[in-house]
From Swiss-Prot:
PTM entry text: Phosphorylated.
Location of the region described as Interaction with TCF3 in the Swiss-Prot/TrEMBL record: 1-183, 149-358
The name this protein goes by in its record: Cyclin-D1-binding protein 1
Keyword tRNA-binding included in the entry's annotation: no
UniProt KW keywords: Cell cycle, Cytoplasm, Nucleus, Phosphoprotein
């Protein structure tokens, strides 16, 4: 009898199942800041690449298994008992701590670019698991769309782990390819808007149809019924070198990626990181320029954003030129692209000089 009383004692101290889930979600959320800023674990042992990836993959499999177990348990009645819930929560927490622990084993000297990809994958898994626990807490005992979406997110994040590049060169190529695609999309959007010669054409046509049907004054509605919604001839003239600069950005990234693919060396991690770091600034700079060409156009803003992009492009080309991926620095493609960037920028300066002087 005495032993039975002792074994039953913990039951009274355990929180209800859903309350335990709420606490678990909070605990998982608290782990995220540490992963974002945490440093690699210092060790005197030589890094074992194969062992790391094996452990990282195994840790991801464990997380996905625990996500499945937890989802099944809390998607039907009766809900698990407090004791069962405690066990589920402990297993989920342990699985998440384990994969974070493996991430901390990845040293910086293997490449900052690759380490960022490993960190991003780890953050996705932790964040998605926290969202799953929250969804199960909010929608228990049912297969709600939110629960299924959250579960699939954890599963997808774990399935992504084996697809992470295994060395810094592969990681650099992965990031550069993404940057090329982003700049390509931005350039195509700019070209499409210019071809239509009216960036807000679709929106204004819809408004005009509604207004004519209802006999409503556009000015009363505050519709953009003025030149601020269109490009002036001066705007269109300024946009031409801006488009050329965006096109040069795409060409720069493609050539840099090709140079890394053909000449990049896996052991030159620092130089690869430098190339990726500066190349990462190109896409956001193109986006800023693209946004500034929409009416009402402010020539000074266009000039500033163009100068920022031109500076980033030239710096990226110079860093690439000085690195091992360009065995012949005198290679004509680098000075050719630098000249193209300078030509675009000089034309933009000419067209905006009056704004600077006024």
């Amino acid at each position: 009898m005495e032993s039975a009383a002792v074994s039953a004692a913990p039951d009274a101290t355990l929180d209800p199942p859903l309350e335990q889930l709420r606490h678990l979600a909070g605990e998982l959320r608290q782990l995220l800041p540490g992963v974002r800023v945490g440093e690699a674990q210092e060790t005197t042992k030589e890094f074992d690449r194969e062992a790391f990836w094996r452990r990282f993959n195994e840790a991801a499999v464990t997380v996905s298994r625990e996500a499945t177990t937890l989802t099944v348990a809390f998607s039907r009645l009766p809900l698990p008992s407090p004791q069962e819930t405690q066990r589920f929560c402990e297993q989920v927490h342990a699985a998440i701590k384990a994969i974070i622990g493996v991430y901390y084993l990845f040293p910086k000297d293997q490449g900052i670019t690759l380490r960022k990809l490993v960190r991003s994958a780890t953050l996705d898994i932790v964040d998605d698991m926290a969202q799953l626990v929250e969804a199960l807490y909010i929608n228990p005992a049912q297969s709600s769309p939110e629960n299924l979406i959250s579960y699939n997110s954890v599963w997808d994040a774990c399935q992504h782990v084996p697809q992470i590049p295994k060395d810094n060169k592969a990681a650099a190529l992965s990031v550069l390819t993404k940057s090329v695609d982003l700049v390509k999309d931005a350039h195509e959007e700019m070209e499409q808007a210019v071809e239509e010669c009216d960036p807000y054409c679709g929106l204004l046509n819809d408004i005009e149809e509604d207004s004519s049907d209802n006999h409503v004054d556009e000015d009363i509605l505050g519709c953009p019924n003025n030149r601020d919604s269109y490009w002036s001839e001066e705007d269109q003239e300024l946009i031409i070198p801006c488009l050329a600069l965006a096109r040069a950005s795409k060409a720069c990234l493609k050539k840099i990626r090709l140079s890394v693919a053909e000449n990049g060396k896996k052991d030159q991690v620092a130089q690869l990181d430098d190339i990726v770091d500066i190349s990462d600034e190109i896409s956001p700079s193109v986006d800023d320029l693209a946004l500034s060409i929409y009416p009402p156009v402010c020539p000074l803003t266009v000039r500033i954003n163009s100068a920022k992009l031109a500076s980033v492009l030239k710096k990226a080309l110079e860093i690439t030129k000085a690195s091992h991926v360009t065995p012949q620095p005198e290679d004509s493609w680098i000075p050719l692209l630098i000249n193209a960037v300078d030509h675009c920028m000089n034309r933009i300066k000419e067209l905006t000089q009056n704004e600077v002087e006024s």
